[in-house]
C-alpha cells in the first residue's frame, strides 16, 4: 500500500516536472529527451521522488503516479478529445489495485484476477481509457474521478506542461 501518515518532503520544481511526465505516461527516455537530461539523471530523480513520498524503493510507475496525484504533488492529466471512460466494477477494482500495488501477485489477490490474465486485462483497460500505459491510466483515473475523488487537485502544473501531452 502507498498510504502513509508520515509527512512527505516537498518535491523540487524539477521533480514535479518529471513526476508530471510520469503521470502523462512518458517513459524515462522520453522524459530525458523532453527535459534535456541523461537517462541516469531521470532514474535518480524518480528514485528520489519515491523516497520523498514514502513509496517503496521498487514501487511501480503506476504506484508512483497515484502517490504523486493523491498527495497533490502534480495535477492530473487534462482531458483530451477522447470518449468518456467509465469502467465496470471489475475495471475499477483493477485500477485501484494497480494504483496501490506494485507486485503482480498482490494485484491478483486484490482483484481476484488470475495472475496469468492480469496483463491482458490491464492492456484492455488501458486501451478502453485511451491511455498510453498504466501510469497514464492512473492519471486519467484521477482526472475522471475514479481515483482520488475525495477532494479536487490544487497543484499547479509544471512550467510548459509535460511534453507530448495527450498523445
Positions of PLM-derived features:
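Short alpha-helical "packing" element that flanks the helix-turn-helix/winged-helix DNA-binding module
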Residues: 15-18, 22, 91-98
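Short, locally clustered residues in the helix-turn-helix/winged-helix DNA-binding domain
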Residues: 23-24, 69, 96-100, 142
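Basic, Lys/Arg-enriched C-terminal extension of HTH/homeodomain DNA-binding domains
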Residues: 54-82, 127-167
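Regulatory hinge/linker segments at domain boundaries
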Residues: 2-13, 74-91
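Surface-exposed interaction/gating patches
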Residues: 96, 105, 138-139
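Recognition helix of helix-turn-helix DNA-binding domains
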Residues: 28-57, 103-135
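N-terminal intrinsically disordered, low-complexity, charge/repeat-rich segments that act as generic
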Residues: 12, 16-17, 32-36
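Sensory/regulatory domains in signal-transduction proteins
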Residues: 10, 24-27
Amino acid at each position: 500500500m502507498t498510504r502513509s501518515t508520515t509527512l512527505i518532503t516537498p518535491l523540487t520544481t524539477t521533480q514535479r516536472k518529471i513526476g508530471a511526465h510520469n503521470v502523462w505516461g512518458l517513459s524515462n527516455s522520453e522524459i530525458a529527451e523532453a527535459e534535456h537530461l541523461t537517462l541516469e539523471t531521470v532514474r535518480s530523480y524518480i528514485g528520489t521522488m519515491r523516497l520523498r513520498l514514502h513509496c517503496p524503493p521498487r514501487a511501480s510507475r503506476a504506484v508512483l503516479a497515484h502517490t504523486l496525484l493523491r498527495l497533490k504533488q502534480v495535477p492530473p492529466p487534462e482531458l483530451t478529445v477522447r470518449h468518456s471512460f467509465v469502467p465496470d466494477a471489475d475495471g475499477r477494482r483493477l485500477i485501484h489495485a494497480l494504483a496501490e500495488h506494485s507486485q503482480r501477485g498482490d494485484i491478483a489477490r486484490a482483484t481476484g484476477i488470475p495472475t496469468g490474465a492480469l496483463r491482458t486485462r490491464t492492456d484492455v483497460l488501458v486501451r478502453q481509457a485511451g491511455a498510453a500505459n498504466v501510469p497514464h491510466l492512473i492519471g486519467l483515473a484521477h482526472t475522471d474521478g475514479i481515483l482520488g475523488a475525495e477532494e479536487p487537485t490544487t497543484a499547479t502544473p509544471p512550467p510548459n506542461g509535460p511534453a507530448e501531452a495527450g498523445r
